[in-house]
Amino acid sequence: MGKQTKLDFGFAKDKPELPTWVNGVPFVDEVETFNATFGKPNNYEPKIPEKKEWQFVYDFILEELEEYRQACENGDIVEVLDALCDIAYVSLGNGTMLHGLKDKIWPAYQEVQG
């Protein structure tokens, strides 16, 4: 993912109001809307898609993990947060909609972490 100009993610501002997510799952609704707007697939039944589809998500997560590692090594907390946000967006949003797990992710998370 291309880097933007210097980010501060609200570190220098008052705390932003937190959104309320549908089904308690951040990023999924945003990705669903993005996909619909730009003609990308939203799957609603659990599936393993073709390799070219899941390979994109896999490669994207690896890229963001590398950016996270570099940010930690550089002591750059803003870039750490940027990488963590990208990892969450891709994992929860893209991964969930790609695999048709929108209605399954939150109950599964609660069970695994509960």
Question: PLM features: what roles do these ranges have?
Answer:
Residues G2-G114:
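Flexible "arm" and connector segments at domain edges
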